[in-house]
Amino acid sequence: MNIMPVSESLMADWLGLRKLLWPDHDEAHLQEMQRLLQQTQSLQLLAYSDTQQAIAMLEASIRYEYVNGTQTSPVAFLEGIYVLPDYRRSGIATHLVQQVEAWAKPFGCIEFASDAALDNRISHAMHQALGFHETERVVYFKKHIG
């Protein structure tokens, strides 16, 4: 396995995995990806198999605003992680997360946070396996006023 930061030349691989993680955001992907590549406080990683197949992706950022369940700022935040089903439970996610931890420390981060949908038990189990612990559950509301 080989892990590398995303670059322009790897956009197609990143896009393919990103669409598997967030299938409902098809049209917005490319614009957001271009924006993310320009930000110094975001990190995008791809993992490749020994046969050079893109098998996992991770997106992380440094957040300075309040992050639920944390006590400090800035905080490293796991924005998204996806490992192809055939490669899960093989340590790939652990290696990706370890790279984020090393990347975030020079920013002054001592906490690493993430979130998951309330009903996404697979994500909850993955987070726990990666060393995260649940801090709180939140339901967001909105109201149209216009």
Swiss-Prot record:
Keywords: Acyltransferase, Antibiotic resistance, Transferase
Enzyme class: transferase
Listed GO biological process terms: response to antibiotic
EC code: 2.3.1.82
Pfam families associated with the record: Acetyltransf_1
Key word Transport present: no
Matching InterPro entries: Acyl_CoA_acyltransferase, Aminoglycoside_N6-AcTrfrase, GNAT_dom
Residues that, per the record, bind substrate: W22, H25, Y66, E79, D115, E136
Catalytic activity: kanamycin B + acetyl-CoA = N(6')-acetylkanamycin B + CoA + H(+)
Binding site for acetyl-CoA: I81, Y82, V83, N120
Domain N-acetyltransferase span(s) in chain numbering: 1-146
Keyword check for Ion transport: no
Binding partners and assembly: Homodimer.
Protein name (Swiss-Prot/TrEMBL): Aminoglycoside N(6')-acetyltransferase type 1
Species name: Acinetobacter genomosp. 13
